[in-house]
Amino acid sequence: MELGTKFPLSKSCKDESRKRKRGITIDCDSQILVGDEQSNSTKTKPYDEICENIVPNYTFGNYILQKIDPNDCRHSLHPLYHRLFYIADVIKQGISEGSLLENKYSYILETEHILLDESRINNLSPSIHASRWCKMVESLTRLQANSELWHIFRQCLLTASSVKWSPNGTINTAGLITNDLPSRGQTESILFGTRNESLAKSLIAALCVSQSSVRTIDNSDKKNEFDNTTTGILDIEKYSCGLMIDIRTGMLGASLDMVMCNRNRHGILAPCLTDNNIETYEIKCRFKYAFCPEMRSELSQCYERLMATKTVQWFRRFLYTIDCPCVDYFRPDNYPRAKEALITSDDDWKVGHSAYHAAQSRIKCNEFEMHHLTLNKNMSSRVWLFGEPDLQTNSIYPLLWNTGERVLSIPIFANPRHQNFKQIFLQSYVASGYFGNRKIVPFLATFIGRHRRQTELGRCFSLFVDDTEASEVVYEITPEQAIPVILIITPVIIDNTFYVGIEESGYRAFGELVDHLWAKQCRI
């Protein structure tokens, strides 16, 4: 694919660009880091404080205007190389300013000359070395929102969490230049998710992840430092994932919540030779169910009945107690609304507001949504229920359902019309470039927790996977975290034949970005 066709510029703009090629300054949205993003202080740094440390300086927009000649776009580098060279510039600038420690980033800069040599002879598709760079960038940004580099590298990217989808099922690439920094302050729902994501991760790691899925590197005798076969409290950070930049186009990005994959001694993703599948998890902590059990409400009463009976009937009643439940019912002869991430057409779930809306509406779906609805409609979700804290031992255990089973299977599946599904789809597309022929197996995790009683405030609780004497603590629930109530794990089936459209959107976005920047520069 030649890039020259993607940068149509007017003659006046081209002429003006020659005059302005040197000494360019623009007011494009920008971020640059101050402070060592790998330091221990960064890990505990407040979210808003990250924003204070990022100041305007050198952006991807600056890079494009300085390095891409609009008159010679046909011979321009592949967009991914431009993205990686910009990242190298940021790291070098951070080192020169003293905001980054050179010894922590030397291993990536030492191979920049190889990347440059390969880019000169390969403008159609990225090289294996470029792929390695992307993996190194991912390893540098695993702190995500607590990483300055993560904020910087996300700029001018179509990210899985923020991309807009057109009604026809394609990505809307308009308005790519936006300020990706988080807004000052956070809503209560965002804070709830931020505080409890690590708790949800520990539940997933303890209850869903097979111990056999994490082995030593290439089955060698040398133990992987990210191995999960040790006992005791789980190290959930080994499943964390940094910014994955689309290896195909360099214009899309995704930061997954959990990736079940080994890493080498440098922290680079390194799946075992026998790993055919790579599991990923997108976690949603549903604040709308965060009730206070000491305040009498319909939700708290349903919770009490659920704790007493442990039946699917009262689980369903609990979910449907609120006005906008997290599971939406639709008629089998119709399509679901885009309102909720989880849906069902099972008649047992035809209750409450969902049943009313299902009877009132006729829904239109695009090809992407209809196809993935067919793929997912026969899938089931797994549900775990957690008991009340034991205040004498400060312990919490999963409960057995009335069937005697620890896991309940319910006819609930992922909604292809919802933004969460499309976010996971784009994540899977980006992640697929990092694991060769291995299949990406995504899941949507729904965590429901409640507020604490007065007697539970200020306490740390030990989380166990069961109530047997042999059970070990897998996580320490901190005083600011919620009391876990329910964990729902929903498989998401993806058809990768739709990846072609995503790739085309990435290339189109790069062309539109260059056009926009140079057109804006011509008007200055």
Swiss-Prot record:
SUPFAM superfamilies in the cross-refs: Restriction endonuclease-like
This enzyme's EC code(s): 3.1.-.-
Superkingdom as given in the UniProt entry: Viruses
GO MF annotation list: DNA binding; endonuclease activity; exonuclease activity
Any one GO cellular component localisation term in the record: host cell cytoplasm
InterPro entries assigned to the protein according to its UniProt record, in alphabetical order: Herpes_alk_exo, PDDEXK-like_dom_sf, Restrct_endonuc-II-like, Viral_alk_exo
Annotated localization: Host nucleus; Host cytoplasm
Name of a matching Pfam family: Viral_alk_exo
Entry keyword set: Endonuclease, Exonuclease, Host cytoplasm, Host nucleus, Host-virus interaction, Hydrolase, Nuclease
Main subcellular location: host cell
Site (Required for function): E197, D257, E282, K284
Annotated family: Belongs to the herpesviridae alkaline nuclease family.
UniProt function note: Plays a role in processing non linear or branched viral DNA intermediates in order to promote the production of mature packaged unit-length linear progeny viral DNA molecules. Exhibits endonuclease and exonuclease activities and accepts both double-stranded and single-stranded DNA as substrate. Exonuclease digestion of DNA is in the 5'-> 3' direction and the products are 5'-monophosphate nucleosides. Additionally, forms a recombinase with the major DNA-binding protein, which displays strand exchange activity.
Subunit note: Interacts with major DNA-binding protein; this interaction increases the nuclease processivity of the alkaline exonuclease.
Name of this protein: Alkaline nuclease
Species this protein is from: Gallid herpesvirus 2 (strain Chicken/Md5/ATCC VR-987)
